[in-house]
Amino acid sequence: MTTLSDYVDFSQDSFKYAALSIAFNPIFWNVVARAEYRSHFLTRIFGSPYRGCYFLAITIFSLGILRDHIYQQALEDQPYYAPVHQPVLGGALFAVGSVLVLSSMYALGVTGTYLGDYFGILMDAPVTGFPFNVTGSPMYWGSTLNFLGVALYKGKVAGILLTALVFVLYWFALKWEDPFTAEIYAKRERERAKSKRGGKNQ
C-alpha cells in the first residue's frame, strides 16, 4: 500500500529545518511587532520609529532569504515524483506569485510592507489598487504561490506538503494580524474625531 512516506523523506534534516523556518518567520515578526507596538523597544533602541522599522524590515527580509534557501535545499534532498513534475504550471504560478509580492511591496513601500503601522507609521488611506483589488493579502498568497510553483517545477511532493504548511501559517497569521491592524487604524480615527470635537469646542 502506497503511503505519503513513499514520496516524502521525513527523515531528512533539511525537511525539518525547512518546516521550522517556515513556521518561525511569521511567528517571529508578529511577536516582535506586537512587542514594539506595546513597548516601543525598537524605537527606543534605534532612536526613531522609521529606523526601528527599517531594522525589522532588513531582519524579516533576511530571514525570508534564509528560509527560501533552506526550502530549496530541502527539495533537493527529497524524492522526485513524476506526476507532480509540472514545470510549465510551476513556472506560471511562480511568476504570478512574484507579481503579487513585488507589486504589493511597490504599492505599500518599505514601512507599509514591513509592519510600519506597529511603529505608529500609518498610511493615509488603504491601498485599493492592484494587487489589492485581486486579493487583500497579496504578499502572503503570492509567497504561497511561489512555494507551490517551485515544488511543481521540481516535481517534489515534499514541496507541496511544505506549501500547505505555508498556507496554514499565513492563514492563522492573517486571523491574528488583520483585527489588530484594523484596531490600530480605528484608534487613529477615534483620536482624529476626538481632536476635531475638541477644536470645535474651543
UniProtKB/Swiss-Prot annotation:
Catalyzes the second two steps of the methylation pathway of phosphatidylcholine biosynthesis, the SAM-dependent methylation of phosphatidylmonomethylethanolamine (PMME) to phosphatidyldimethylethanolamine (PDME) and of PDME to phosphatidylcholine (PC). It comes from Emericella nidulans (strain FGSC A4 / ATCC 38163 / CBS 112.46 / NRRL 194 / M139). This is Phosphatidyl-N-methylethanolamine N-methyltransferase. GO terms for biological process: cleistothecium development; methylation; phosphatidylcholine biosynthetic process. Residues 67-90, 176-202 are cytoplasmic. One of its GO terms (molecular function) is phosphatidyl-N-methylethanolamine N-methyltransferase activity. It is a multi-pass membrane protein. S-adenosyl-L-methionine binds at A95, V96, G97, E177, D178. It catalyses: a 1,2-diacyl-sn-glycero-3-phospho-N-methylethanolamine + S-adenosyl-L-methionine = a 1,2-diacyl-sn-glycero-3-phospho-N,N-dimethylethanolamine + S-adenosyl-L-homocysteine + H(+); a 1,2-diacyl-sn-glycero-3-phospho-N,N-dimethylethanolamine + S-adenosyl-L-methionine = a 1,2-diacyl-sn-glycero-3-phosphocholine + S-adenosyl-L-homocysteine + H(+). GO terms for cellular component: endoplasmic reticulum membrane; mitochondrial membrane. Its EC number is 2.1.1.71. It is an enzyme of class 2 (transferase). InterPro entries: PEMT/MFAP (IPR024960), Phopholipid_MeTrfase (IPR007318). The chain crosses the membrane at residues 46-66, 91-111, 155-175. Residues 1-12, 34-45, 112-154 are lumenal. Belongs to the class VI-like SAM-binding methyltransferase superfamily. PEMT/PEM2 methyltransferase family. PANTHER family: PHOSPHATIDYLETHANOLAMINE N-METHYLTRANSFERASE. It is found in: Endoplasmic reticulum membrane; Mitochondrion membrane. Pathway: Phospholipid metabolism; phosphatidylcholine biosynthesis. Residues 13-33 dip into the membrane without crossing it. Keywords: Endoplasmic reticulum, Lipid biosynthesis, Lipid metabolism, Membrane, Methyltransferase, Mitochondrion, Phospholipid biosynthesis, Phospholipid metabolism, S-adenosyl-L-methionine, Transferase, Transmembrane, Transmembrane helix.
